[in-house]
A protein has these predicted regions:
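Cleavable N-terminal signal peptides of Sec/SRP-targeted secreted and luminal proteins
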Residues: 1-20
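Membrane-proximal C-terminal cap and juxtamembrane stalk of leucine-rich repeat ectodomains
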Residues: 18-34, 217-344
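LRR N-terminal entry segment and analogous cap-like coil->beta motifs
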Residues: 46-103
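Conserved LRR concave beta-strand detector
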Residues: 51, 72-74, 82, 96-98, ...
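Canonical position 11/12 of the leucine-rich repeat
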Residues: 57-60, 79-81, 103-105, 127-129, ...
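Canonical leucine-rich repeat
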Residues: 62, 83-86, 91, 107-110, ...
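C-terminal capping segment of individual leucine-rich repeats
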Residues: 66-68, 89-90, 113-114, 136-138, ...
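Leucine-rich repeat domain C-terminal region
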Residues: 140-143, 147-284
Length: 344
C-alpha cells in the first residue's frame, strides 16, 4: 500500500513541475529549470526563437526575472499600464513584442531605446496617446500595430529611418495621413475608422511604394469641382495602389478634368522619395559588396596561413626525420667502431 502511495506522490509532483513551464518540441531544450516570475510565464520555441508568453490578468508590468535571451515577448491580454525606460532593459535581443489588449497609457521616451533588433511591435487596443520619438529610428523595425488607441496627428510628426513596411492605425484620432516624412519602404497603411476628411496626391507621394491604403469608415470628401477626385483616381491607378473604400468619380468630373495633370510639387516629392530608396538600396548593395570583399580577403589570408602552416609542418617533419636519420647513422657508426675495437 505504501508503495502505491509513493508512486502517486511522484507522478503528482512530476505533473505539477511540468505544468509550470510549457516547452514545445524536444525536452532537451533546457528551459525546464528556468526561474518563473510570479505570474506564470510559459517558454517555448517559435521558429527556432526563444519565446515567452506572460498573458495574465494579474500582470501589471513587464516581468523582470525572465530569461535575458528571449526573442519573442507576448504579454497580451494583461493589465500593464506603463512602459518605463527600464521595462525592457534586461531583454536586448527582442525581435517581437506583443502588448495588445492592455491598459498602457504612458510610454516613457527611452522605453524601446535598447531594442536594437526589434522588428515587430504590437500595441493594439490600449489607451495610448503618445509614442517615443525614437521608436521609428530603430534600424530593423518593419511592422507596427497601433490600432484602437488615442493617437492624434501630432504623435506622427516625426522623421522615420526604420525600414517600416506595415503601419496599422485603425480607430485612432487622426484627421489626416501621418506626416512622417518620406516612407519609401511602406507598403501597407491602415487608417480606417479615424476622422480623416481629405487625402491628397501630395500626401500619397511621400509613400512612393505604397501598395494598400485602407481609409474606410472615414468622412472622406474628395471635391469634384476642383478635380481632386479625378486626380486621386489617376494617381491610385498609376501607382497601382489598392484603395479602400473604392472611390468613384462622376462621369461629368472625368469629362471636365480630362486634361488635369499632377502638380509639380507632387511629382517632386515622389521623385525625392524614390531617390531615397534608390540611395538606400545602393548603400546596402555597396555594403554587401564590401562584406563580400572583406570575407574573400579573410578567406585568402586564412588559406595562405594554412598553406604556410602545412609547409612549416612538412619542413619540421623533414628536419625531424633527417635528425633521426643522422642519429641512426651516428649510432650505427658508433656500434661499428665498438665492434671493430672489440675484434682487435
Amino acid at each position: 500500500m505504501t508503495f502505491f502511495v509513493l508512486i502517486i506522490l511522484v507522478v503528482g509532483l512530476t505533473m505539477t513541475t511540468a505544468s509550470d513551464v510549457l516547452i514545445l518540441g524536444s525536452t532537451s531544450m533546457g528551459y525546464a529549470n528556468q526561474q518563473e516570475s510570479k505570474v506564470h510565464c510559459r517558454y517555448s520555441k517559435a521558429y527556432s526563437m526563444l519565446q515567452v508568453k506572460c498573458s495574465d490578468p494579474k500582470l501589471e508590468e513587464i516581468p523582470r526575472d525572465l530569461n535575458s535571451n528571449i526573442q519573442v515577448l507576448d504579454a497580451s491580454f494583461s493589465r500593464i499600464r506603463d512602459l518605463r525606460n527600464d521595462s525592457f532593459s534586461s531583454y536586448t535581443k527582442l525581435l517581437y513584442i506583443y502588448l495588445g489588449d492592455n491598459f498602457i497609457q504612458n510610454i516613457e521616451e527611452s522605453a524601446f531605446a535598447q531594442q536594437y533588433y526589434l522588428e515587430v511591435l504590437d500595441l493594439t487596443k490600449n489607451g495610448c496617446d503618445n509614442l517615443p520619438k525614437n521608436l521609428f529610428q530603430l534600424p530593423y523595425l518593419r511592422r507596427v500595430y497601433l490600432a484602437v488607441n488615442k493617437f492624434g496627428d501630432s504623435v506622427f510628426q516625426t522623421e522615420v529611418t526604420s525600414p517600416l513596411n506595415f503601419l496599422q492605425l485603425h480607430r485612432n484620432k487622426l484627421t489626416k495621413l501621418p506626416e512622417m516624412g518620406y516612407l519609401p519602404t511602406l507598403q501597407n497603411l491602415n487608417v480606417s475608422e479615424n476622422m480623416i476628411s481629405r487625402i491628397t496626391t501630395k500626401e500619397l507621394a511621400r509613400f512612393c511604394y505604397l501598395e494598400v491604403l485602407d481609409a474606410s469608415k472615414n468622412p472622406l470628401n474628395l471635391e469634384e469641382d476642383n478635380c481632386e477626385c479625378v486626380i486621386m483616381r489617376r494617381w491610385l491607378k498609376l501607382r497601382k495602389i489598392i484603395f479602400k473604400p473604392e472611390y468613384n468619380c462622376t462621369p461629368a468630373a472625368f469629362e471636365r478634368c480630362g486634361n488635369v495633370t499632377f502638380s509639380n510639387e507632387t511629382l517632386t516629392i515622389y521623385d525625392e522619395c524614390t531617390n531615397i530608396l534608390r540611395i538606400q538600396m545602393q548603400t546596402k548593395k555597396a555594403r554587401n559588396i564590401w562584406i563580400i570583399v572583406v570575407c574573400c580577403v579573410a578567406c585568402f589570408i586564412v588559406i595562405v596561413f594554412l598553406v604556410l602552416l602545412c609547409f612549416h609542418r612538412r619542413n619540421k617533419r623533414k628536419k625531424q626525420k633527417l635528425k633521426k636519420e643522422q642519429q641512426r647513422i651516428a649510432a650505427n657508426n658508433a656500434n661499428t667502431q665498438l665492434l671493430n675495437s672489440n675484434l682487435k
